[in-house]
Regions:
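Extracellular beta-strand-rich solenoid/capping regions of secreted or surface-exposed proteins
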Residues: 57-65, 77-91, 98-144, 159-165, ...
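Surface-exposed loop/turn motifs in large extracellular/passenger domains
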Residues: 109-119, 137-148, 165-168, 188-191, ...
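C-terminal segment of N-terminal export signals and the immediately downstream linker at the start
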Residues: 26-41
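Acidic Gly/Asp/Thr-rich repetitive segments characteristic of extracellular carbohydrate-active
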Residues: 39-71
Length: 452
């Protein structure tokens, strides 16, 4: 056994010389590092005061051709309008590798290709104006995008814009975007998860389609705070999460605080699911499913402090077909100065083909639950809910042309203006239907409710 392991001194010396020669090989001929190619091999220097766009672009192109990640050491790199080819991977040290925009419509962009990865980078916009159709990172028609563990700050426009992309945007921090933190247009099946978004000028996460069609994006486990509406409007801006024309989108388990308008707004968004979100301090309705949509599941959300809680609306434009189940809504009635006071303070409002079941609503100075708006009421059931401390417990439209509603098994406490009251738009036109008068409205079924 010892013979097999006997060491030859001459062989050992020869091996040592060979190892030393390998260590002394010039940098330009260095093999791939464990984490990929080092950008320093191409003359890219962290902390250099000059613009390093040309050197960085050369390094990106070489690494992409080699199908290897490009590694950027800790430090500041000043550059702009860097182009990413198919398979490009830029890897930095989280919180320490900083790319600062100097020029161009974007800091990093790509058109076409697939498998583009950005990881561990801090990308700074430096408040340099960006075109509306671009972003600090702008990817067009890229498959299998991955943006992870990055920080994006001071984008004077959109922080990230994804057009016609699919892939994953996860665990990033986006702060101070003048327009949107993340704008996705005509993309499919994105996973947007675990991001922290703060101080966006017009929107947190926007999932849009240019025409109504399948999207399938999942927006989950994000924290979105302090969303403004710098461009004004009546709800086009100022939403933490906005889904527009995009069908089959799931918005779940997000924590949303302080938005100029809405926590989650689905506009013409068919088959949207809004599940388990925590929504606090909204200046308009906390959760909206509105305009020309068919299909919405709104369940298990916690809403505290908003103008209104949940609105499933615009039957006049085709908005219909939803379930509103298991939500906790409290402390509504905080009114935007530019909105009429009579529209504030509703816990849950619905119009057509909707089941409202198992919700708890507390402190709703207008109405705990409102069913219908003028003639826009059809096939609504309101069952097994608890309403406490409201103006009207349940307000139901009884104008000519309003359709059917079933109101059963609800518990209503402290409804100052009546437990169940018939309405013509904002105006009450009946007494408390729980006590008397319900027989005049055969389209209403009112049974087994309790009030005190």
């Amino acid at each position: 056994m010892m013979g097999a392991m006997q060491i030859d001194r001459r062989g050992l010396l020869a091996g040592s010389v060979a190892s030393a020669a390998a260590l002394a090989a010039p940098a330009v001929a260095a093999p791939l590092a464990a984490q990929g190619l080092d950008a320093a091999q191409f003359g890219v220097r962290p902390g250099a005061p000059d613009d390093q766009t040309t050197k960085l672009q050369r390094a990106i192109d070489r690494a992409t051709r080699a199908r290897a990640p490009l590694w950027l050491a800790p430090g500041v790199y000043r550059a702009g309008d860097l182009k990413l080819g198919a398979g490009a991977q830029l890897i930095g040290v989280r919180g320490a590798t900083r790319l600062v925009l100097t020029r161009g419509p974007s800091l990093l962009s790509a058109q076409g290709g697939e498998a583009i990865t950005l990881s561990g980078l801090t990308l700074e916009g430096g408040d340099i104006p960006l075109p509306q159709e671009s972003g600090l990172v702008h990817l067009l028609a890229v498959k299998a995008v991955r943006i992870a563990d990055c920080t994006l700050t001071s984008a004077n426009g959109n922080a990230v814009k994804l057009d016609q992309c699919d892939g994953d945007v996860s665990r990033n921090t986006m702060t101070g975007a003048a327009d949107n933190a993340l704008l996705c247009v005509d993309s499919r099946g994105l996973v947007i998860a675990g991001n922290s978004i703060r101080n966006s000028g017009n929107g947190g996460i926007r999932v849009w389609q240019s025409a109504k069609r399948h999207d399938g994006t999942i927006v989950a486990d994000n924290t979105i705070e302090d969303t403004a509406a710098r461009s004004g409007g009546s709800g086009q801006y100022g939403n933490a999460i906005n889904v527009f024309r995009a069908a089959d989108v799931i918005v779940r388990n997000n924590v949303i605080r302080r938005a100029a308008f809405t926590a989650v707004r689905g506009n013409a968004a068919g088959n949207i699911q809004i599940l388990g979100n925590h929504c606090f301090a909204l200046q308009e309705t906390a959760v909206y499913s509105e305009f020309d949509f068919e299909g919405a599941v709104i369940a298990d959300n916690v809403i505290d402090t908003a103008e209104n809680g949940i609105a499933v609306t615009n039957f006049n434009d085709g908005g219909r077909l939803s379930t509103v189940t298991g939500n906790l809504v409290r402390n509504v009635g905080v009114r935007r100065p530019d909105n009429p006071p009579e529209g504030a303070g509703v816990g849950i409002g619905v119009e057509a083909e909707t089941a409202v079941t198992g919700n708890v609503i507390e402190v709703a100075p207008n109405a705990g639950i409102r069913a219908g708006w003028g003639p826009y009421l059809r096939n609504v059931t309101i069952a097994g809910n608890v309403v406490r401390d409201a103006g009207y417990g349940i307000a139901v439209s009884v104008v000519n042309g309003a359709g059917d509603a079933s109101i059963s098994g609800n518990v209503i406490a402290g409804a100052r203006l009546g437990a169940i009251v018939g309405m013509e738009w904002h105006k009450a036109v009946t007494g408390d239907l729980l006590k008397d008068g319900a027989a005049r409205y055969p389209q209403l079924t009112i049974a087994n409710n309790r009030a005190r």
